[in-house]
Amino acid sequence: IPAVIVGSNGHVAWGFTNSYGDWLDFYRVDWANKDRSRYRVAGGQQALRVASEWIRVKGGAPVELKVRETRWGPITAELDDKTSLALRWTAQLPGALNFGLSDLAVAGNLDEGLAAADLAGIPAQNLVIGDSGGRIGWRLTAQLPDRAGTCEPTSPLAVADNCRWRGWLPPTENPSLADPADGILWTANNRTLDGDALRLVGDAGYANGARARQIRDALRAKPKFTEKDLLAIQLDDRALFLTRWHQALQDEAARSGSVELKALADAARTWDGRASADSASYRIVRAWRLAVIERIQNGLLAPAQAALGQRFVMPDLPQMEAVAWPLLQQRPAHLLPRRFESWEQLLADAATDIHGQLSAAGPLSDRTWGERNTASICHPLAGALPRVARGWLCMPADPLPGDGNMPRVQSPGFGASQRMVVSPGREADGIIHMPGGQSGHPFSPFWGAGHAAWVQGEPTPFLPGDAQYRLRLAPET
C-alpha cells in the first residue's frame, strides 16, 4: 500500500499490532457427481465455477492455474473422494482492501484518526492512536464480517449449519476504546476482548499474555514517561514468565533421581531472570518447559492423532501454558500421557531429551541463549543464491537478547518489525528502530543503516536527516 503504515504527522501518532481474530471459515463441499462439477447446497445443487489464472514465466511457457470456486470461496483442500474444503476469507471479498489508510496522514486529532481508520481496507489490526492534545484510543480496524446462522469456528461448516456472510458490519460495531480512565493502552498480539466482543471477533491464536502484562505493569509504574523511558519498556528482556518454571526445575531436580534433570538444574541454578544473549540458565529453562509442554500436548491429542492418522496436523496452541501449568501442579493420573508411568517420569524424560540436545555441543554452562537466538535476517532473494554468496544479502548473525514472552520480542527470523516512540508534535524527540534498515537494495549506501542500533537498542532519531538524494518522477507528456 503506498501509504505511511505507522508514524506521526504532528497531530496524531499511530501504530498497529496483529488482531489474531477469526477472519475466515472453512465450508464442507459435498460433491453431487463423480467429476466434481456440481456440489450440494441448501435445497439442491450448484455448478462449480472454474477460472484460469495464467502465470507468465520469463523464458518459458505460461503456466495455467485453475481456481475452482464455490459460492463460499475457492477449494483449498481435499478431505476424501466425496468431500473438499472451501475457504471464505475476508481478504478475498470485495471491499476488503483499499487505500483508506493514507487518510491517517492528514488526520488532525483522535476523532479524525479513528474515523479514517474506519474506512481503511487493511487486514484487521489493533490500532493504538494518540493526538497532540493528550487523547488516546484503541480500535479494531478493518472490515469485519457479518456472520449469520450457525457459524461454529472450531470445525468445517456444513450446508445444514446455514452459516452465511451477509456482508460487512458497520464500522460502529468495531470494538473500540477512547480516553481510558487510567490513561494507558497496551496491546502485544494478546487477546484484548471478552464476552460478546470476543464472540464477534473470534480466536485465531492470540499470543500468550505474558508480554502484554509486562508492558501494562511498566506503564502503570510511573505517571509520566520520556521517550527513552518508553524505549526501555520495548527493550525489557526480563523473563518473568519463566521464573516459576525455573523454580519448578530446581524443585523437581531436588526430589528426582534423574541424573539429566539434576544436571540441567545445576547448570541453570544461577538465574539472572533475563533472556540475555549470554544466559545459559534462560536457554535451559526455556527448552525444558517446551519439552514438558510438548509431551503433555501430545498426550492430550493422542486420541485425535490415532483417529485421523496421516491427516492429523498438530495444532499451534499458544495458550497451552494455561493447560500445562495446572496439570503440573495437580498431576491428575487420568490426564497423564499413557507412555509415562508418572508425572515425575514425564518431567525427567523431558530433561533427558534437552540434556542430550544441549550437551552434544559441549558443556551445558556454555549453551547460551545467544547461541540459539542468533539473527537470521536476509533479503527475500537470498534463498535463490548459492550458500557462499547468500551472506551478501543478510544482516550480521548477531546473538540477540529477548524472546517471545517479553516486550523485547525477537528471534532469529521473527520479531517486532520496528520500534517507535513518538509524541505527536514532538517528533524531533522521537525514536525509531528498524531491523535490516529501510533500504532493500544491497548495493545502496544505506543498506543495513540503523540495523546495528536495533540490535544494541541504541536510540536513533525518528525524523530523517538532511536529504542527500532526490528521486523525481516526471511524466513524458
What do these predicted ranges mean?
Residues 261-262:
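N-terminal small/hydrophobic-rich alpha-helical segments that act as secretion/targeting modules
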Residues 1-257, 266, 270-477:
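C-terminal/peripheral segments of proteins
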